[in-house]
Amino acid sequence: IIHAGGEVVFDRREETNNWKGIYQLKPYPIYDAAKRLKRDMYIDGTFMGLSFHIKKLLPIWKGGMILTDNAEAADWFKKARYEGRSEKYYKDDDITFHGWNMYMTPQQAAHGLAMFQNYPEHMSDLGEDNGYRDLTEFTVFKNHRTIE
């Protein structure tokens, strides 16, 4: 959110922090779905981040995915994940913006696809047994607005 120019507002209210599987980064149409992976979970018109960490529902060690129904955003995400490059030969590409080196390796992708072959039809959301440290305790977030 911050790197995209948005404002982060921390909400400490119980009703906001009692989530399971998925939560929205309000007021944006962005959902963190790192603890959910099941059929028909996508919410139209949103950007939904999935995580494939070893402790998540599709444990391929690292990586993730952004679900969206916005074709323009999907094209941008594809370029952004691979240093701003298109899906062309490097010699034929014209890089128009700085991206990141965040693409999934072919081996990781193949492992994930293989795991999907036996993925359960219905999967429960993961909980967060140990919780997360309050981000407002970190110096980098001290000056952000907080709702009590």
Feature names for model-found ranges:
Residues 1-40:
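PLP-dependent aminotransferase-like
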Residues 28, 46-47:
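Proline-centered loop/turn at the N-terminus of a beta-strand
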Residues 38-39, 47-148:
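Active-site region of PLP-dependent enzymes
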Residues 43:
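Nucleotide-sugar donor-binding and catalytic loop/hinge architecture
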